[in-house]
Amino acid sequence: MKPAERRKARHLALQAIYQWQLAKDNVADIVEQFKLEQPTKGVDLPYFELLLTGVVNNVTNLDATFSPFLSRKLDDLDQIDKGVLRLACYELTYCKDVPYKVVINEAIELAKAFATDDSHKFVNGVLDKVVKQMGLRQ
């Protein structure tokens, strides 16, 4: 799969995760809605579905992965930041074919595209600690 197709899948997945976080809609319904309403040309759709369902099905474990490194309570975290961290922690934990540096870079780019001005710095700092804790840094 081309990196650009995965990048687009991450963009869509973050938007879908955001929707799920706010509305708690059924994941299958969100997937269908996104396929109908979002431009999916050049998107790795199976990867999009994997990321969305993976985050939703593992949200408690993912939150436990990054929560110790937050400077505030999880409930006080911006929804986009929370979605980016959940998505990145899912990839770090379950998508072993994706190098951790790629995961962090993609998370930073998502934060720059969708979140507040300094969110990318916050996301980078948290994920740096997660990677260290997971023993992924060489």
Curated annotation (Swiss-Prot):
Source domain of life: Bacteria
Cellular component GO terms held in the UniProt record: cytosol
GO biological processes: DNA-templated transcription termination; transcription antitermination
CDD domains: Terminator_NusB
InterPro entries: NusB-like_sf (IPR035926), NusB_fam (IPR011605), NusB_RsmB_TIM44 (IPR006027)
GO MF annotations, alphabetized: RNA binding
Residue ranges of coiled coil: none
Keywords: RNA-binding, Transcription, Transcription antitermination, Transcription regulation
The protein's role, per its UniProt record: Involved in transcription antitermination. Required for transcription of ribosomal RNA (rRNA) genes. Binds specifically to the boxA antiterminator sequence of the ribosomal RNA (rrn) operons.
Family assignment from sequence similarity: Belongs to the NusB family.
Protein name: Transcription antitermination protein NusB
Species in which this protein is naturally found: Tolumonas auensis (strain DSM 9187 / NBRC 110442 / TA 4)
Gene designation per UniProt: nusB
